[in-house]
Amino acid sequence: MNYLTSQLLINEEIETINNNLKNQSDLWEDGKKTAGSYASKVKNNLQINRNSELSKKLAELIKNKLLANPLIKSFALPKLIHGIMFTKSQKNMGYGRHVDNPFMSSGRSDLSFTISLTPKDLYEGGELIIETINSENKFKLNAGEIIIYPSTYLHSVEKILSGERIVCVGWIESYVKSIEKREYLFDLDAGAKGLLAKHGRSDELDLIFKSYSNLLRLLGN
């Protein structure tokens, strides 16, 4: 399965975001407003109005954190980060099985991401389920942790049994659309950087970095 989990936000950032969301409780609205015609039938959560100044400010914070993270940049090769929103699921809320729209008003969805803003021991249920051809994978993230996965996968969020789950979600349009090609580039980049850290610069390593850059030019769009 082609996905990445990583700690993205520090405690101070999580606290700042949550305090802002709590202070603007009037901005929460029905999550169905931004779902596609099919997904709206299985979506049951709340979200902050994306046109609000608060949403725009917090979305910019998240976008900057993603673009400043070398691991995420290497994995996702982000061309555009878009559609960032903040959602809340309370008791008996969830999001049924669906696939994300391939094209949104804000861009193409190659990769989807979820960032947890709630400690996982403060709510029951609410696991993110991502389906592949032969497996079903459940994730319950630590506060500040992100998961990035292909938007082509069917996925769902289980009903909340108690407490509430607040997350940030969004999409990435990648310079490389293909899952397989992104994986090859990620492996090559990680291997080259590992060799550089272990052995230092060399003429041979220069050729590997050259090949990576030229492959990205060839495969990217």
From Swiss-Prot:
Fe2OG dioxygenase domain location: 80-174
Annotated residues for binding of Fe cation: H98, D100, H155
Assigned keywords, A-Z: Dioxygenase, Iron, Metal-binding, Oxidoreductase, Vitamin C
Free-text comment on the cofactor: Binds 1 Fe(2+) ion per subunit.
GO biological process: DNA damage response; intracellular iron ion homeostasis
Amino-acid positions noted as binding 2-oxoglutarate in the UniProt annotation, renumbered to this chain: R165
GO molecular function, a single term: L-ascorbic acid binding
Cofactor field: Fe(2+); L-ascorbate
A Pfam family this chain is assigned to: 2OG-FeII_Oxy_3
UniProt-listed Enzyme Commission number(s): 1.14.11.-
Record InterPro entries: Oxoglu/Fe-dep_dioxygenase_dom, PKHD_hydroxylase, Pro_4_hyd_alph, Pro_4_hyd_alph_FE2OG_OXY
PANTHER family according to UniProt: PKHD-TYPE HYDROXYLASE YBIX (PTHR41536:SF1)
NCBIfam families: PRK05467.1-3
Name the record gives this protein: PKHD-type hydroxylase A9601_13531
Organism: Prochlorococcus marinus (strain AS9601)
